[in-house]
Amino acid sequence: MGISLSKRRRDNNNNHHHPHHNPPYYYSDPPPQQPPPQNGYSYSHNYPVSTPQLSLPPPPAQPPSSSQPPPSQISYRPYGQNYHQNQYYPQQAPPYFTGYHHNGFNPMMRPVYFGPTPVAVMEPPAPYVEHQTAKKVKNDVNVNKATVRLVADDLNPGHYLVSFVFDALFDGSFTIIFFGEEESKCTIVPHLPEAFPPIKVPFQKGAGQKFLQAPGTGIDLGFFSLDDLSKPSPEEVYPLVISAETVISPSSVSEEPLVHKQITQAVLEKTNDGSFKVKVMKQILWIEGERYELQELYGIDNSITQGTAASGLEDTGGKECVICLTEPKDTAVMPCRHLCLCSDCAEELRFQTNKCPICRQPIHELVKIKVESSDEQH
């Protein structure tokens, strides 16, 4: 019996009674003031409630004060019926809503937000960039556009002759046309055929050959204004057009000869010393019935394309992608023509930004280019 009473006393000493309090965020008005606890770490704010615009009923009456000691002095939980009669249970006042919201510093209280629900602002997605795969074509003849010049005709003062360097895989012919316009199937039509008839000159296959127009067949540019020579007309009539053409014999009698062309369109600018400089504006290919416009790519290795008839490419850096710095670059950015990305980085870039990583110009499209060695079959 003594052991049982001792155990019950120990249980009573170890179980302390803590009166139940509703969480303060259930009240829109500050909760009723409670006696301060013994630890002294709780603070209550007694701010007056001022609601001049609302007519509110008086708060309910508080329960009568009791002669019992404060809750903090009760330290025994009732275990049986004999303890209930001496136990003190504090009564809580019902919630009283007044429109007053207490936003004091209290981690247990929820902040009150007035106004519409905030809407998350989403950033607009990057513009979609079209991703294409380049088609490799074989150019039979190429005019090196950096070597196109006008040379004075010594036998005819005031006249100029056309000169340039070219590479050819097959025999063919050049047609020099002054003030010519491109029509269907890359056919060049002269606008002044009576005054300046087209001049056709044959050539043989070979690399690094130099072409010079025959004396006496040049043009006198003194009849034209500088404005007409320095830019194409609205109808796309260029002052100088060079058409290089090769004809491949068919394998059978029933087939027609295969005609390939490269067309170089240029304007003429007068320099300070009185001479004229050729500025190539566009180069066009006509291969197997398809029209292609040549554009230089910046960042490709010229050593890969050595031995071909026409590279038209410039090397401006390493072979690695400028994003990951590991994979070889095989994708060009248009229209700035920077070959600087690998296919994987280009696929990610097209959904994230529309700026070239080299020059930061807008990207219109991405072109994947597969560079092969010259001895591979096409």
UniProtKB/Swiss-Prot annotation:
UniProt region (Disordered), positions on chain: 1-79
Q: What is its EC number?
A: 2.3.2.27
RING-type Zn finger ranges: 321-360
- Bias-annotated ranges (Basic residues): 1-21
Pathway entry: Protein modification; protein ubiquitination
Gene3D superfamilies referenced in this protein's UniProt entry, alphabetically = Zinc/RING finger domain, C3HC4 (zinc finger) (3.30.40.10)
The EC category is: transferase
Mind listing the GO molecular function terms for this protein? ubiquitin protein ligase activity; ubiquitin-protein transferase activity; zinc ion binding
Catalysed reaction equations from the record: S-ubiquitinyl-[E2 ubiquitin-conjugating enzyme]-L-cysteine + [acceptor protein]-L-lysine = [E2 ubiquitin-conjugating enzyme]-L-cysteine + N(6)-ubiquitinyl-[acceptor protein]-L-lysine
Zinc-finger in keyword set: yes
- What note about domains is in the entry? The RING-type zinc finger domain mediates binding to an E2 ubiquitin-conjugating enzyme.
For this entry, the protein name equals Probable E3 ubiquitin-protein ligase LUL3
